[in-house]
């Protein structure tokens, strides 16, 4: 008796969305220099799903449809993995940005505890202290950009959270991290040349800063391990050094260095940029600003006190209306991937256009209107409000960043009067990876 032959079902035929005919080099340049403008123009012409061909990422499908974004974010990493290349070019192969599938899952489980729940409450006093220290230098009665101050605050906060104390080594990190992040952010959107043009070239400068960073890290790790109270320390470095994976193994020295660099860089620039936008926005909305001050004042003093519903809603709306990181990406692993009506072949990447979804009037009515009331008494959709990305690769530090922004805003509102302005909103400025207010989130303040 012959056996029946089971034929596996045929894969659906590839069906791609419309693609721009612009030259590949022009697409790459526009994507690197002005993604928001480019994506908005192409979405008007082709709709919420269209294809690009970028020098760095290759063939890409851009998705600005919330339901399709939800599908992408809820698809497992076996089908949709990490885009290549990624920010591991800046942070190293041991960074969470470099990892995929099970390696990525293991690392996130190890990193999550310091940045969630009760753990982040331990950092509130540090944030308030650093905010008061930095804002003591603010001028009164004259315009100044808040972004540099926010960069200082968020860098100092993450340094203290990671290492637990000060010292000469942290002063060295304060010296090298800001220019490293600024240059790295610009280069991240550009292909890396095959040839090394020396230590005075942009990529050579990044390599030199990395060499200096590794020397500092060796000293900090040695000092941490030698601390008689090492077992009781609560800083992130100590937690990493003591942590083990499920199989009992520990993070390597290189992986710890790469991961801490990721936290230092990604953990301060994006939060600082959002805070700069927050001051730019509230200074142009007098009624909102007055209500925020009343909320902060009525809450009483002390870092653990007080209601913050309006302040939280304002932070949510800043992240929607002035999205700092405007895309999240995945790479197709199976022979084909069905995305709505489209069938995407292996090797393609998919970019979720966060900014375009945040501007969608079907999801956020009158999206150009800055209105924190959207979130009073309700939570935004986890697949439409997506400043931290979504799914398995959502930012592991999202809760920490939200708490940090809340404490910084509350502290400033309690100690300063922010003058309102009817000046036009500041333009968007692309720093490579992040978007900041072009003039740095300028405000005028007076001490209360």
Where are these regions (language model features)?
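N-terminal membrane-proximal hinge/A-helix region immediately C-terminal to the signal-anchor transmembrane segment
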Residues: 2-100, 106, 121, 125-133, ...
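Cytochrome P450 heme-thiolate monooxygenase catalytic core
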Residues: 2-14, 80-88, 103, 119-273
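Cytochrome P450 proximal C-terminal region
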Residues: 3-8, 12, 43, 131, ...
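Conserved cytochrome P450 K-helix E-x-x-R motif and the immediately C-terminal K′/meander segment
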Residues: 28-47, 301-340, 361
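Cytochrome P450 catalytic-core helices
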Residues: 270-295, 399-414
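Conserved cytochrome P450 K-helix/beta-meander segment immediately N-terminal to the heme-binding cysteine loop
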Residues: 352-378
């Amino acid at each position: 008796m012959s056996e029946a032959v089971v034929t596996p079902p045929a894969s659906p035929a590839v069906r791609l969305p419309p693609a721009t005919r612009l030259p590949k080099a022009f697409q790459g340049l526009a994507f690197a220099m002005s993604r928001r403008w480019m994506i908005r123009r192409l979405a008007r012409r082709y709709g919420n799903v269209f294809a690009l061909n970028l020098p760095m990422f290759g063939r890409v499908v851009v998705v600005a449809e919330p339901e399709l974004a939800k599908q992408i974010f809820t698809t497992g990493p076996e089908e949709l993995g990490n885009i290549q290349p990624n920010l591991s070019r800046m942070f190293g192969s041991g960074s969470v940005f470099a990892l995929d599938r099970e390696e990525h899952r293991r690392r996130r489980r190890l990193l999550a505890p310091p940045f969630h729940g009760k753990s982040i409450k331990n950092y509130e006093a540090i944030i308030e202290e650093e905010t008061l220290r930095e804002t003591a230098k603010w001028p009164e009665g004259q315009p100044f950009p808040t972004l540099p101050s926010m960069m200082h605050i968020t860098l100092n906060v993450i340094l203290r959270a990671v290492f637990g104390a000060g010292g000469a080594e942290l002063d060295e990190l304060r010296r090298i991290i800001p220019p490293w992040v600024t240059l790295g952010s610009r280069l991240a959107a550009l292909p890396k040349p095959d040839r090394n043009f020396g230590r005075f070239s942009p990529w050579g400068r990044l390599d030199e800063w990395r060499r200096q960073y590794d020397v500092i890290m060796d000293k900090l790790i040695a000092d941490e391990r030698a601390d008689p109270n090492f077992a009781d320390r609560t800083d992130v470095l100590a937690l990493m050094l003591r942590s083990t994976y499920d199989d009992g193994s520990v993070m390597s020295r290189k992986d710890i260095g790469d991961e801490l660099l990721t936290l230092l860089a990604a953990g301060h620039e994006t939060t600082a940029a959002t805070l700069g936008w927050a001051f730019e926005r509230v200074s142009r909305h007098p009624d909102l600003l007055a209500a925020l001050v009343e909320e902060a004042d009525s809450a009483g003093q002390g870092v653990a006190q007080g209601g913050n519903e309006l302040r939280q809603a304002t932070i949510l709306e800043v992240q929607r209306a002035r999205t700092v990181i405007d895309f999240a990406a995945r790479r197709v692993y199976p022979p084909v991937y069905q995305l709505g009506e489209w069938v995407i072949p292996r090797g393609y990447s998919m970019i979720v256009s966060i900014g375009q979804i945040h501007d969608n009037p079907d999801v956020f009515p009158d999206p150009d209107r800055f209105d924190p009331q959207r979130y009073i008494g309700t939570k935004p959709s986890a697949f439409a409000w997506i400043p931290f990305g979504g799914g398995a690769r959502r930012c592991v530090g999202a809760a920490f960043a939200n708490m940090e922004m809340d404490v910084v805003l509350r502290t400033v509102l309690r100690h300063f009067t922010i003058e309102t302005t009817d000046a036009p909103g500041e333009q968007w400025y692309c720093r490579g990876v992040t978007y900041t207010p072009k003039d740095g989130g300028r405000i005028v303040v007076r001490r209360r």
